[in-house]
Design a protein with these regions (language model features):
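Detector for outer-membrane/organellar transmembrane beta-barrel domains
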Residues: 235, 239-358, 365
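C-terminal segment of classical bacterial N-terminal signal peptides
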Residues: 14-23
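C-terminal closing repeat unit and adjoining cap/tail of repeat-based domains
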Residues: 362-376
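Outer membrane beta-barrel
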Residues: 28-63, 69, 73-212, 229-234, ...
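Bacterial N-terminal signal peptides that target proteins for export
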Residues: 1-10
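Sequence/structural signature of outer-membrane beta-barrel proteins
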Residues: 54, 98-100, 115-121, 152-158, ...
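Outer-membrane beta-barrel "beta-signal"
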Residues: 365-368, 393-407
Length: 407
């Protein structure tokens, strides 16, 4: 049964890929609108749609463009679903002003996609996706130094796997080594080298504490991180070099945060969350390789430990390789794993995810602003039914055909 539905959708996808006619190559740059007082507004983004077929049930985030790990319970029979998803679709407004303090100029960014609050059940609600804010920040920059205040990615977010289906929820995100989240805060970026062969950038960030709400704070929506009265802190050092035949980058980032596990109004100790992540990429000719590794404690709010909160320790990593057959045809392979340490993780719930592995592959066609991809994702998740119970494994598979137009 599984081979039948996989083969059917794969053949259909390859026929559609083969039928695409060539288009003139062009690089998306966004639409620039000139405003008063020397300001400009750049409108950019993309339309993204995915048609997918799943065998087995994914858990946590969802079944479509946000599928990441296998659910603990699976259908005994009739496992196949066919569905569509357009919530990756994104729009970005970037405002740029003239210098106001010496060489420092203001810039403001507002970005949104359609992974907002769920708008109801089928047959109609699931076709009415709602907007959500991704970024909302204001910069003051002279090119070398940028002060950013507002909502943006924590430095821990790092590298991002290439995909046409899993964009807002990247491959392995909160499931197989890909961590990080966006928060309101203060971010400082400074290029330590200028005009050198290797660019070195320092990033410092202090942003909103985060964590699940407990006790009376559930009603007020105050999480454990906010209740601690302390920010999350991160520092990143990035190295990169670009050349016609070889480009590479490498980074290391450290993280610390605090959570008041008893919430406001109740005396108690804070839980300290820590993490270290290293990652990078290398692009020799037509090949590309990228990935990252993290190890940490109590960073579920950053999508660590297979997105499990509390006093949990563990590590995760992912690696993706790609090859450009031609300027238009490329292939990618992905593997990621996240492995909480059961013996050192008292915060794991009775029914817990103790390991997850994601394997994915994509064949991609690009012609200017247009891209089409056929992807396969398989999640293998190890569950623990109770504390000290015998673990068991579940799996779920997704075949997806995705299209994107970038503007």
């Amino acid at each position: 049964m599984r081979l039948t539905w996989c083969s059917g959708l794969a053949v259909m996808g390859f026929l559609m890929l083969g039928g695409v006619r060539p288009a003139l190559a062009q690089q998306p740059t966004g639409q620039v609108v000139r405003l008063g007082d020397g300001q400009t507004l750049t409108i950019s983004g993309f339309i993204n749609a995915t048609w997918f077929m799943n065998s087995g049930r994914f858990g946590g985030f969802g079944q479509g463009q946000n599928a990441e790990w296998a659910d603990s319970t699976q259908p005994a029979t009739d496992k196949t679903i066919l569905d569509g998803d357009v919530r990756n679709t994104r729009i970005n407004f970037t405002f740029n002003g003239q210098p106001v303090l010496g060489k420092f100029s203001p810039r403001a960014v507002l970005e949104a996609d359609f992974f907002g609050a769920f708008n109801g059940a089928p047959p109609f609600g699931d076709e009415q996706a709602q907007l959500r804010v991704r970024f909302a920040y204001v910069d003051l920059t002279n090119g070398r130094t940028t002060l950013r205040i507002g909502q943006f990615w924590s430095p821990l977010f790092g590298a991002v796997p290439v995909s046409l289906s899993h964009i807002a929820f990247p491959l392995g995100y909160g499931a197989a080594g890909k961590v990080g989240w966006r928060y309101p805060g203060v971010f400082l970026y400074h290029d330590l080298t200028v005009g050198k062969p290797v660019t070195i950038q320092l990033q410092l960030a202090a942003f909103e504490g985060s964590g699940p709400a407990v006790g009376a704070d559930v009603a007020t929506g105050v999480g454990q991180g906010e209740a601690s009265g302390m920010p999350q802190l991160e520092a990143l050092l990035n190295f990169s070099k670009r050349s016609p035949n070889l480009s590479w980058s490498a980074y290391i980032v450290g993280h610390v945060d605090w959570k008041d596990t008893t919430g406001t109004g109740v005396a108690g100790d804070n839980l300290t969350g820590t993490a270290v992540e290293v990652g990078g990429s290398i692009n020799p000719g037509k090949f590309s390789v990228q990935g990252n590794f993290y190890t940490g404690k109590a960073i579920g709010q950053q999508f660590g430990h297979i997105t499990q909160q509390g006093d949990v320790k563990g590590w995760g990593a992912w690696l993706q390789g790609g090859y450009d057959f031609t300027p238009r045809w490329s292939v990618f392979g992905f593997y990621g794993v996240d492995d909480p340490k059961e013996a050192d993780s008292p915060g794991l719930t009775a029914r817990a995810r103790v390991k997850n592995e994601d394997v994915a592959g994509m064949l991609r066609f690009r012609a200017g602003r247009y891209a089409l991809g056929l992807e396969l994702l398989r999640a293998n998740t190890t569950w623990r039914p109770t504390v000290g119970g015998v673990t068991f494994k579940q799996d779920a598979t997704q075949v997806a055909l995705s299209v994107m137009y970038t503007f």
